[in-house]
Amino acid sequence: CIRDRKIPLLIGIDAIHGNALYRGATVYPSPITIASTWDENNSYDVGIQTAHEMRSTGSHWAFTPNIDVMRDARWGRVGETFGEDPYLVTQMGTAMINGLQQGDFTGTNKVIACAKHLIAGSEPINGLNLSPMDISERTLNEIYLPPYKSAIEAGVFSIMAAHNEVNG
C-alpha cells in the first residue's frame, strides 16, 4: 500500500471453495456440485458467506466464480466449473457474483468478484490444460460468451483472462 499516493492494498484469494485457505473457514462443495442442485439461491448464499469470511480475514478480492462452460470431461479443471450447460453456468455464476459483491462490493462484508477465465479455456485440444482452442464463432457466441455477458450486466468488477490461444 502506498499511503502517500492513496493506492490501496487489495488482497485476493482463489475462493473456488470459499475462504478455504484459512483454518476454521467454511469449505464449500466444488462449484460443479453446487450447480447440480440447480438452486441459484444456494450459489448466492455461498457468495455471501464467502465474502463475509474473506473480509473477516482481511481479503478483498475473490478469484471466483469460474464461469467456463465445461465442454471436455478430460480437462483437469472440470470441478471448478458450474458444468456444461451455458444456461446453468450463467445463472449460477451470476448468483455467485451477486452474493460476493452484493451490489457495489463496498462495505465490510462484500468483496470484489472475478469472473474467470475469459474465454473458452474449457475446450482444449485433447483436454490438456493450456492447449489451444479451435472453435467456431457460433460456438463462441452461443456457448462461451453468455455467462460473461450476464456477469458484466450483473456488475462484476473484474474478469480474469484465460491463458489459452483461441483460433490462433
Residue ranges: model-predicted function:
Residues 3-168:
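Glycoside hydrolase catalytic-domain context in secreted enzymes
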